[in-house]
């Protein structure tokens, strides 16, 4: 293994100067400590009668932004969840072999007859450490502010561990947390919580190294990705995934079909259920938290897909369609779905039911093929729930703005309220180079309607494999989309950050403005460049270079 670049480390001063520190909140039910980032403000701002000289921020960076933690990527992160000692009586070692990192780890699985999923515990009325963790995390230590916030004619209520349990039990939310991913800091995906975003990484046959992919994963977390999907299709798929998992504080998802296809020599016709099953188990033992499985595409859908302008654009969907046509048999992911669920149940892996027939252009949006598959995904949702497996549903894709709402409405109707996870949607087909913005526009709208998680798109979408800088652009732009949707849905903690930004802007508190933004580094750089270009390098003026000292409207409005 080559030495990792120093760039994998993300000290806080790179983003927030000296204004930020890592803080932890202890649980009341379980021995947990929830990490957040507390941002100190240069001024004290009063919002709804509450004074704020600092604000806790939701933090996805894990220990990477904690200067008190020494991290060696070749050993991986500390196994946070092992300390909670929950669920041990229901699990057993798979084998005595450790993984491929320096830190030896014995994979676990559920004992025979036991269910170790968050859904199973929630249905029994049991609050797990993960449930308490996400309740504390969603509140951000802002219970007083939340309780003062008016919404729907009444004040909001802080999240409780019991509310989290109820949402998971009802299938409206999932906590993806494989028992073999102890480095994970639990998070929740559901429409009654903060809108989350996912960042896709992974090598391809065209290039990228293990080190580059681990670095992308770490920086995706640092910039705000709530989950990361490793979509590697090149060489060293197993090793790449192992290193990402051992160094990831966020849930990791995969599409197991990609590795199964590699094992089949890249020939879809050579795939078998047994080969795919073994791949599921291999990845389950490594610690993958959720699988995208394209079990909803059936032979009956293929004629409608064949009439499309751009056919099948999902890689997993195209693989299964090819297999079905060549072998003249039904999708083995569908016919073996019960067995798939039993595997997932043994490790608490959530299933992300893949949209193999998502539209690849706006002309194909909301067509017979797309909604035919969605109906099957709803049926599979009920079947997965019978096995105590957590479920979310994947969605499009390319959808014109006027058809976005119908996607959300159909998903809720056909999939029984399971969380929706969409790729955008992209609302036009002509934004090459700017598809991250294209995606964020559609993503904002569908998230405001109730979508739980947005899959980011980078500027390289449709053009090439993204690098670290593309990952940053994609993550931040989709954080804007998710945050805008949270505002529209009345999320009190999201609103507070905007209100503090507005007050800082009116007070010309430049450092607070930088630090309260979603990309403090870029805000600070653009400000400095603009000041330098105008010859102003000293002090923090009560105006910006856009208006200058004589035309600043905020300055004028404060004059007596």
Curated annotation (Swiss-Prot):
Cofactor binding note of this UniProt entry: Binds 1 [4Fe-4S] cluster per subunit. The cluster is coordinated with 3 cysteines and an exchangeable S-adenosyl-L-methionine.
Keyword terms, alphabetized: 4Fe-4S, Iron, Iron-sulfur, Lyase, Metal-binding, S-adenosyl-L-methionine, Thiamine biosynthesis, Zinc
Q: Which domain of life is it from?
A: Bacteria
Q: Which residues bind Zn(2+)?
A: 398, 462
Q: List the disulfide bonds.
A: none
Residues binding [4Fe-4S] cluster: 544, 547, 552
Q: What does this protein do?
A: Catalyzes the synthesis of the hydroxymethylpyrimidine phosphate (HMP-P) moiety of thiamine from aminoimidazole ribotide (AIR) in a radical S-adenosyl-L-methionine (SAM)-dependent reaction.
Family annotation (PANTHER family):
PHOSPHOMETHYLPYRIMIDINE SYNTHASE, CHLOROPLASTIC, THIAMINE BIOSYNTHESIS PROTEIN THIC
Q: What is this protein called?
A: Phosphomethylpyrimidine synthase
């Amino acid at each position: 293994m080559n030495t990792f670049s120093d760039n994998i480390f993300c000290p806080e001063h790179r983003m927030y100067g000296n204004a930020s520190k890592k803080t932890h909140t202890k649980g009341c039910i379980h021995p947990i400590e929830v990490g957040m980032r507390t941002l100190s403000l240069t001024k004290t701002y009063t919002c709804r009668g509450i004074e704020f000289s600092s604000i806790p921020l939701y933090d996805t960076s894990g220990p990477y932004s904690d200067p008190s933690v020494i991290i060696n990527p070749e050993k991986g992160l500390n196994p946070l969840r092992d300390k909670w000692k929950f669920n041990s009586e229901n699990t057993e070692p798979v084998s005595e072999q450790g993984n491929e990192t320096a830190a030896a780890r014995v994979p676990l699985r559920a004992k025979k007859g036991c269910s170790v999923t968050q859904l199973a515990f929630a249905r029994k009325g049991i609050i797990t450490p993960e449930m308490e963790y996400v309740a504390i995390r969603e509140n951000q230590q802002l219970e007083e502010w939340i309780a003062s916030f008016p919404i729907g004619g009444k004040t909001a209520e802080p999240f409780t561990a019991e509310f989290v349990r109820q949402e998971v039990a009802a299938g409206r939310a999932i906590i993806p947390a494989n028992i073999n991913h102890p480095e994970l800091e639990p998070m929740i995906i559901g429409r009654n919580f903060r809108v989350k975003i996912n960042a896709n990484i992974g090598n391809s046959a065209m290039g990228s190294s293990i080190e580059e992919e681990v670095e992308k994963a770490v920086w995706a977390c640092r910039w705000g990705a709530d989950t990361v999907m490793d979509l590697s299709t090149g060489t060293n798929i197993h090793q790449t995934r192992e290193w990402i998992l051992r160094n990831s504080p966020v849930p990791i998802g995969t599409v197991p079909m990609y590795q199964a296809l590699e094992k089949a020599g890249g020939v879809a016709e050579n795939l078998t259920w047994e080969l795919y099953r073994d791949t599921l188990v291999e990845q389950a033992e490594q610690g993958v938290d959720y699988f995208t499985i394209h079990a909803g595409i059936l032979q009956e859908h293929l004629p409608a897909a064949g009439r499309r302008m751009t056919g099948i654009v999902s890689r997993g969907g195209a693989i299964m369609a090819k297999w079905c046509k060549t072998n003249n048999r039904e999708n083995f992911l569908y016919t073996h779905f019960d067995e798939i669920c039993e595997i997932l149940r043994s490790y608490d892996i959530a299933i992300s039911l893949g949209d193999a027939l998502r539209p690849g252009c706006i002309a194909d949006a909301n067509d017979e093929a797309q909604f035919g598959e969605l109906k099957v995904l709803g049926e599979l949702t009920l079947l997965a729930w019978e096995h105590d497996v957590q479920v979310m549903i994947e969605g499009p894709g390319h959808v014109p703005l006027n058809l976005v709402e119908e996607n959300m409405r159909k998903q809720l109707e056909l999939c029984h309220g399971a969380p929706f996870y969409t790729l955008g949607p992209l609302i036009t087909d002509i934004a090459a180079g700017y598809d991250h913005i294209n995606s964020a526009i559609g993503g904002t709208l569908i998230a405001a309607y109730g979508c739980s998680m947005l899959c980011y798109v980078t500027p390289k979408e449709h053009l090439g494999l993204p690098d670290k800088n593309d990952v940053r652009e994609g993550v931040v732009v989709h954080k804007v989309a998710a945050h805008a949707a949270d505002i529209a849905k009345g999320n009190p903690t999201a609103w507070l950050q905007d209100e503090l930004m507005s007050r800082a802007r009116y007070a010309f508190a430049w450092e607070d403005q930088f630090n309260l933004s979603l990309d403090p580094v870029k805000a600070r750089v653009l400000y400095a460049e603009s000041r330098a270009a105008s010859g102003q390098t000293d002090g923090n003026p009560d105006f910006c270079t856009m208006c200058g000292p004589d035309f600043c409207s905020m300055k004028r409005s404060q004059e007596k």
